[in-house]
Amino acid sequence: GQIMYNAVKDFKKPVVALVHNAGSAAFLAIAGVKEIVASGELSRLGSIGALVSLDRKFIQTYKDRFDEIYSDLSSDKNAGIRSYIETGDSSLIKQSLNETVLAFQSIVTAHRDVKKKEETLRGGMFQAKDAKSRGLVDIIGTEDLAIKRLKTYFK
């Protein structure tokens, strides 16, 4: 999402995004476009958040099979995952996720006129009409409409 967002941001011409489903990284990728067109009323957008999935069985197998030895000069390396593996404490991982979400929200609100911010930025997905009322979509329509909207920027 971040790489595509940067590419759109640096692109010298307006970009109109036509999407059916755009959640999480896909929404980040289109956050800076000139207009977002939802392809129909069943389109869903949002999921402005972050998560990490950790396989407990894999972690237990990893703990049983491997020893990790860190340099005395690298005591903070992988601190979040190390804390989780060693003690089950996910607080450092959550802290990192929270920082990521705040940055994600900042990007979205810098480019979109987000309504109902507290609700909209909690990670939910919204169908097209609801997403439009929240400022996540500009218009609901077809590919032809998206092309027409794009052409208006080149007159």
Set out the residue ranges of the language-model regions.
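Small-residue-centered hinge/linker elements
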Residues: G1-K13, A22-H111, T152-K155
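Glycine-rich beta-to-alpha transition loops that act as phosphate-gripper elements at the mouths
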Residues: A17-G23, T120-G124
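Glycine-centered flexibility sites
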Residues: A25-A26, G46-G49, G123, G135, ...
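Short linear loop/turn motifs
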Residues: L73-K77, L121-G124, D144-K148
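Short, flexible active-site loop motifs that bind/organize anionic cofactors or intermediates
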Residues: S83, L121, L136
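Short coil/turn linker and secondary-structure boundary residues
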Residues: I85-G88, F126, G141
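C-terminal long alpha-helix characteristic of the crotonase
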Residues: K94-E118, A128-K155
